[in-house]
Amino acid sequence: MTTLMVQGTTSDAGKSTLVTALCRWLTRQGVKVVPFKPQNMALNSAVTADGGEIGRAQAVQAQACFLAPHTDMNPVLLKPNSDTGAQVIIHGRAVTTMNAVAYHGYKEIAMQAVLESHRRLSESYPVIMVEGAGSPAEINLRANDIANMGFAEAVDCPVLLIADINRGGVFAHLVGTLELLSPSEQARVKGFIINRFRGDIALLQPGLDWLEARTGKPVVGVLPYVMDLHLEAEDGLDQRQTDKVEQVLNVVVPVLPRISNHTDFDPLRLHPQVNLQFIGPGQPIPPADLIILPGSKSVRSDLNYLRANGWETAIDRHLRYGGKLMGICGGLQMLGEHLHDPLGLEGAAGSSAGLGLLAMSTVLETEKQLRNVRGRLTLEDAEVSGYEIHAGVTTGAALEQAAVQLDDGRCDGAQSADGQILGTYLHGLFESPAACSALLRWAGLENVQSVDYHALRERDIERLADLVEKHLDGTLLRELCGLEAT
């Protein structure tokens, strides 16, 4: 068994994307490879077949390996619920909420979970492709590190260091990161990868030669800037749009301070007939055909944010003029009459008034609901699949008019009697082509084009593997993976 780790000089350097690319590149060669991220901090997550929760990036990487997501692929997941605290998820299950200081003391326990998962994967897969987190050179986070070099040292694996040249200062990033590592950690770095380059590679070559001479380490390759690559963002909100046709549906989403699983909106962002706008604090709220309240890791706090930024008034006006309103997960809970958090799971214990648009109330409970589901939208009997990640239990008369009839016999969500408002606990429902088309028609779009989001994701994964094949040193990569040269 061989473990190869990808670390980055910064956040968003391209670690997740490179691991996805390497996983598919190796899989195409018949190599049995599995993705792994020791510790992930993100509000975008996925549900595994065994009812656990992992980072969404690892679910995409699993797809690149043609594997079902498993909790061992991301044994530690941190989901921030305040500026200083986060829910700690170990092996797919929420175990506690901690502030940063408390978690620092918890890292030894977390490392045990990380090494346990790595050991289990090593028993079934000859190659483990690991993604680091942030930068390995964060001096204040070096003690008891489990996400980067601390893990690499523990399992004795080689490391590739990737940097984003599009940000500028790529050579300073690479050399500076290397020099901030200990001698043993520096020895683990077996090469550099430069990401998102655009221009004439000949103009970059003198810099590459200098880098290799300065560090004694090879440049494994230079990956080009790809304009229209659309894989789910691990954490940051992706607001890029595809080209639109003349007839579009205007969809508006508030950017909540604790927005979660905003990858729900990627299929809409890529749809040629949808103009998707994310509205941040202080921005004017534009007219829309459809307003969607997204998921939230701190629903009561984010509901206060909506009120403070004029959204409650804007929603009332929107509905008065015939617009459609949708809530997903935390957004569904906001649509009801009351939100109760008696245990203080998402902040201070207490209750808040909801928007009062659907006759229902929610109580937050300790046990989180985690499951992948299939069913049919009651709108058009359209097939839908998605996943539930929520701690709330919602009850009330509004649920009698469900939004989704699930295959397991349960009903999900609610619709208003006038058909203007719809809420659901299901994340990922826009990824189902039939359900997406049905919801867009409900919101007022005529002659809806069907878009297969899963096919688009698969196409992009294949494109990534092609880039590895063309631009990186395959012989060195195979050697680092413990494989013979082809």
Swiss-Prot record:
Q: Where is the signal peptide?
A: none
Q: Which InterPro entries match?
A: Class_I_gatase-like, CobQ/CobB/MinD/ParA_Nub-bd_dom, CobQ_GATase1, CobQ_N, CobQ_synth, GATase_3, P-loop_NTPase
Q: Which residues cross the membrane?
A: none
Give residue ranges for domain GATase cobBQ-type: 248-435
Please give the pathway this protein is involved in.
Cofactor biosynthesis; adenosylcobalamin biosynthesis
**PROSITE patterns in alphabetical order:** GATASE_COBBQ (PS51274)
Q: Which residues form the active site?
A: 329, 427
Keywords of the record:
Cobalamin biosynthesis, Glutamine amidotransferase
Q: Which Pfam families match?
A: CbiA, GATase_3
Q: Which SUPFAM superfamilies match?
A: Class I glutamine amidotransferase-like, P-loop containing nucleoside triphosphate hydrolases
User: What GO terms are given for molecular function?
Assistant: ABC-type vitamin B12 transporter activity; catalytic activity
Which BP terms does GO give this entry? cobalamin biosynthetic process
Q: Which domain of life is it from?
A: Bacteria
**Database matches in CDD domains:** CobQ_N, GATase1_CobQ
Record Gene3D superfamilies: 3.40.50.880, P-loop containing nucleotide triphosphate hydrolases (3.40.50.300)
Family according to the record: Belongs to the CobB/CobQ family. CobQ subfamily.
Function statement:
Catalyzes amidations at positions B, D, E, and G on adenosylcobyrinic A,C-diamide. NH(2) groups are provided by glutamine, and one molecule of ATP is hydrogenolyzed for each amidation.
NCBIfam families in alphabetical order: cobQ, PRK00784.1
Q: What is this protein called?
A: Cobyric acid synthase
